[in-house]
Amino acid sequence: MRVTDELVLFWGANDVYSNFYYFPFVHQGIRFIWSEQAVMYRKAKLFGADAIASKILKANSPKECKVLGRSRQIPFDEEVWVKNRERIYKEVLREKFSYARTENAILSTGDRLFAEASPFDKIWGIGLAEDHPDAENPDKWRGLNLLGKVLTEIREEIKSGRGGNGLG
């Protein structure tokens, strides 16, 4: 993770803002280990792929969750996913960042913009590594940075008193 005056550039399992970060939390009454697991579970359920959703709950890593979430056994519809993906991410991450430790972490970023500095992800990330010369210039990002936008929205909700529950 790299923090500048204006950005929080993150990517990888060691960064609390990453969906691969180990942080058990409860979402919709189910205990998840990583937010990636919760998102992929919700994705599978959205498309009625209950068998895949069950496998996601038993996964041993966030990478395994991601692979299962992309399974051809899910009757995926791009239009349906695009309509629902940001809402699902926001609902999941709102829960993850409702615990005191994660809430404090997200609030500690001030007003900086979150940027998932994944060189591989052009939807949820910026499409650039954190050490890329253009990583600090949002106009030059190659990705949509949807994860960064969702995290920024959640932080603003918490700051305005509309989010968080102060749990452990």
Predicted region positions:
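Charged, low-complexity intrinsically disordered segments
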Residues: 1-168
